[in-house]
Amino acid sequence: TLVYSKLIPYLTENLERNQMIVGDLVANRGHHNLILSDRLQHLQQLRAMLPAELWELTAMIDGKMTSKSAKAKRIQAIEDMRSGRIRYLFASFGLAKEGLDIPRLDRLYLTTPKKDYAVVTQSIGRIARTFEGKGQPVCYDYVDNIGFCENQWKRRRTSYRKAGCIL
């Protein structure tokens, strides 16, 4: 049987997989990107793999940013994305559930597998908001060739259909 606690490190530490994700991020540099993962270390790794010229266009937020100064940084990162000063916001799934309202977002990257309907729907909702001049939002869902991951994809696919997404 598959042990989930071993699967996530296997996926998040896979260099080829991470290079594919970063390739998608670089290809979408003109968009406003929300990158979600279960692991803060994974988000840090993806961010570090971006070309240096894109680093100033990134911010990372997570639910552990609870001290006064960390909370201020989190609020500033969200405001920077709202205003368009940054193009990449790296966040934990947990934080994305906490009413992250940035209508400008138009690209979503689900970098670790999720099956929970509420989490998937809330994540999609982050890019579904209307914003002047915003094109069709796109969600990148990375499905690994592992039975467990494929089964979770089937559940997410159902969530996407219920949310009115085009697959």
Regions found by a protein language model. Give the residues of each.
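Conserved P-loop NTPase
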Residues: 1, 152, 159-166
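Short glycine-/polar-rich loops that comprise or flank the Walker A/P-loop
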Residues: 55-56, 103-107, 132-139, 163-165
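Conserved interdomain hinge at the start of the Helicase C-terminal
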Residues: 1-51
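A short beta-strand element within the Helicase C-terminal
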Residues: 90-91, 98-113, 121-122, 137-142
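Conserved helicase ATPase core of P-loop NTP-dependent helicases/translocases
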Residues: 34, 44-45, 54-97
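Conserved nucleotide-binding/hydrolysis micro-motifs of P-loop NTPases
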Residues: 40-42, 95-97, 113-117, 128-129, ...
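Amphipathic alpha-helical transducer elements in NTP-driven molecular machines
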Residues: 18-19, 71, 93, 117-121, ...
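Conserved segment of the helicase C-terminal RecA-like domain
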Residues: 126-159
